[in-house]
């Protein structure tokens, strides 16, 4: 079930909107979390466990860093300036070690799943015999969106370490931040400070937001299904039989391919933005997507 599928737009979203609106205000965030996990499970099945593991680790690291800051505040009570400086440096080192531990675990899992097989295959080719054959993750599937929520988790832990945000004490809030369904598969990577003001409010649906959201969603569908998919027919025809065409046609196909890629990604981003808009959730980072789209596709 992709963002541009009929099931997502005409079944999943309406049911989610209805459940969200009927739920008590304080439970609406949990409703979004439940539907986010359902969406991810429909996409990846049991690979949901990676998202759950990342959520648990991120939450624990955030709490750990907060506890260290609390201990530091208590430890410096009644001390002079010089002693406070020594204690502060000591706790900064402790916090840095905790942060590095969390980052290494997350990047270790991501690197193993995404790149270990690539490196071992090339090393085996280079040396002429299998390298680390027993460690290759051939039977492991790649969780959808793991790069996005891993980097988002690292950003959250880093912000807690630097004191720019307070760590969440309720794990469902951390889980919703990392797993909110409109951005779990394609991004964008949001900072906690960009979404916190709207993600957890649980405010009721507003007519204007629903209308604007669906207009944005259908505009994204138009880009994907009418422009990108139609462009793909021409591009594939030329690229699959390039020997039958002259240079001008091949150049036109290459330009068409760039347009296809841009419209696919731009259309998907419009659907994502529109999905968030339905609930009145529109992170600051979403407003800068146009520059991001251009850079990513070109």
Predicted features and spans:
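Membrane-embedded transmembrane alpha-helical bundles that form the catalytic cores
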Residues: 1-296
């Amino acid at each position: 079930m992709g963002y541009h599928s009929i099931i997502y737009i005409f079944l999943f979203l309406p049911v989610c909107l209805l459940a969200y609106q009927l739920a008590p205000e304080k439970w609406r965030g949990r409703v979004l979390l439940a539907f986010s996990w359902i969406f991810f499970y429909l996409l990846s099945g049991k690979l949901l466990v990676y998202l759950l593991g990342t959520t648990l680790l991120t939450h624990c690291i955030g709490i750990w860093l907060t506890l260290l800051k609390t201990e530091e505040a208590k430890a410096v009570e009644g001390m002079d300036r010089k002693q406070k400086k020594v204690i502060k440096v000591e706790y900064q080192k402790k916090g840095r070690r905790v942060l590095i531990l969390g980052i290494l675990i997350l990047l270790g899992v991501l690197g193993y799943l995404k790149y270990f097989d690539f490196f071992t295959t090339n090393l085996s080719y280079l040396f002429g015999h299998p390298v680390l054959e027993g460690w290759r993750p051939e039977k492991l599937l790649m969780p959808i969106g793991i790069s996005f929520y891993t980097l988002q988790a690292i950003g959250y832990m880093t912000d807690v370490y630097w004191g720019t945000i307070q760590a969440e004490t309720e794990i469902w809030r951390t889980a919703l931040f990392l797993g909110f369904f409109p951005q779990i598969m394609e991004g964008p990577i949001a900072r906690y400070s960009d979404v916190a003001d709207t993600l957890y409010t649980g405010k009721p649906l507003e007519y204007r937001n629903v209308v604007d959201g669906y207009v944005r969603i259908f505009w994204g569908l138009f880009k994907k299904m009418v422009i990108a998919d139609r462009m793909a027919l021409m591009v594939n025809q030329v690229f699959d039989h390039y020997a039958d065409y002259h240079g001008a046609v091949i150049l036109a196909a290459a330009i068409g391919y760039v347009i296809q890629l841009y419209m696919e990604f731009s259309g998907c981003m419009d659907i994502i933005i529109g999905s968030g808009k339905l609930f009145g959730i529109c992170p600051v980072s979403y407003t800068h997507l146009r520059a991001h789209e251009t850079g990513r596709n070109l």
